[in-house]
Amino acid sequence: MENPVVTTVSADTAPHASDDRAVRVEEFSPLRPRAEDDPQRLRGRVMKALDHYFLTRGSTYLSGQREALSAIVKTVLDDSHQGVFAVPLVPGGGKSTLLRALLTVFAEVSRDMSDPIAQRLGGVVVVVEKTAEGDELEELCNRGLEPGEPAVARLISSTNDYNLQQGKCLTGTAATYADCLRKDCPSAAVCPLLNAMMHLAESPILILLHARLAQHLPDLTPFTSWCEADGTEHRRTLILIDECPALVREEVVSTLTINAAENDLLAQRDSRPREMRHLKWRLQGSWNHAIRIPFDRLNRQLSGEKRDAAILTPEELSDVGMTGSALRETQEWLTKYKAPPFSPAVRMTEALLQETGKFFHFGKNLEVVVPSLQTIRSDGPLRSFIFSGTAGLLPELALNPDIDLLPTELPESYERLTIHVQRDGVIGMTRTGLQRSGAVQAVALWLQRLLPEVAQRHGRVLLVTYKFLSQQLLELLEEECRSLVYTVNMPDGSGPCLPYFGGVAGSNEFRDATAVICLGMPRVEPRVYLSRALAIDPDGAHREELSHAAEALERQPCVLDMQDHYLAHDLVQMAFRSRLRHHGDTTPVELWLTQPPGPVLKLLRDYFPDCAVDECPTLPEDCHLAVSTARQRKGSPANTALLLNALLAVPEGEEITPAQLREQTGLTQNQYKEAIRAPSVKELFRTEFITFGSGKNQKIRRVSSKNAA
């Protein structure tokens, strides 16, 4: 254990050497022993556990890394400062190891709740993304317990594919979530997965998954209390969250969600008791008056609206009858009905009462969207730490007035990283652009050239694209190129595919890759960025900007700024799936990006200081040709495509006349003249054809067949 005393020195009387270099001891303040229950007494033990993990894993500290981790430990143990803190510890910087070191010591202390520090700490809540991680931490905390000794930690995890695939179904009939009968199962009353929430109060260390945390935010009071076997009650005062939780919540009000919320309400209580029938009748009447009828009025009122989305003012909602007084009355009836706080009806009513920005959106049906930024709180002290390597890029952390961003980033140069930026716009690298005729074939041609070149320097390449494209693109690659890329299996078992956006988060499977190619950008629907702009709006500036927007809301600066930050965040995470997360390594790493927005590239350069950026303005000519020969107009081949395909069918050394070309393609004289002036046709003539003669005597001879049909 480190020395459990604090030495403080007055700023006005800092020690300085006398003539004989002796320090005057009287200038020091008296030594003050730490209190017996001071959690800072654990700091030395945590660092010792951290050193042990680094040693057993064959890792060494980078310059300044141990000091940075020690400072984080000190902050975590300092309960004099309450609040929510974001810890921007870079991916690969020791976050997971630090969490395990903290839990190792917390578990040791919590085995004896008579320990003063254990009593002051009360217990810990830990939140992870995956059930497998939770299982691992539960086992870590409970390691070394004597027979009959109560568990120190418990994972609260319900029915999901992972648990069922581990054989945790009591009846043995469910192997996936879709197989589980849930409440209709004959063993539902005794199923530990369905009744997981009954075990909240059984151990000092409680392990949750992100999905459950998101359900209960912002109030985590139900997760703070627990009792020993003798009934002694304790309050957990610390929560450690691995990666940023879903702090932006979006409540959607539509005919579908109103119906679903009402059906859920009716199913909660038995209607046989007369009093309950009366209560349901009163609740339904209030619900219809406050929400259903006003929404129907709004739907009729907006039926002629030309815009797809727009901000809704409080006056517009009040005009259709969606008023605060009516909604508060519904809230009172929901309380009398004892509706669960996270039930859809309660959430919808609370959201509509919020003063945050709301907007309507036309998709398949009218939707009123109410985004909000959640915080973390309880009815007692609960210090919260969110460990996120990209916290500075996440607006819900960096711009959240309720969260303090700790200055804990490790200084590092990324000279070994080169970012290649492909800018050629002949192929739109969006989801829509890559579904256009010929786009995927053109991309495959580019990759056929690029992959062998990159693999020669780096070995296997992490090529990531959209999920809808991941199987098709893999099949289009020649066998030689398929062996140069990482592959994964489609979740539905339909076969191998390329890794895809949204499917590699948190994976260490590609940690040895030194080249990453992102084919496309990991964008989500524009409406999502609009929601985030309204939710993350501490001073109301975004709402004001969007209220006066003359153009589409998703094109407004505040929404585009949200998009840029989230794209940069996702691309940084993608880069760290590779060997780049091996800090201190000198192996060169390449990141290929296709048509990233300028602001996104700037954010990446700021995040990766000293990295090199290589702009690639054009794709190979055969990629351009592949797009041009497949171009369509109103479902039929374009005139340019018809002419190009006819020219490519001419064997090398053979001749053809314009009249023959018009006959083969069905083009008129004017259409032929227009098509022959197209840049792609001009380029093909420049590289593979010569013409001689003029007028009716003109002939066209193919002299090269490098782009043979």
Residues of each region from the PLM?
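ASCE RecA-like P-loop NTPase motor cores
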Residues: 2-709
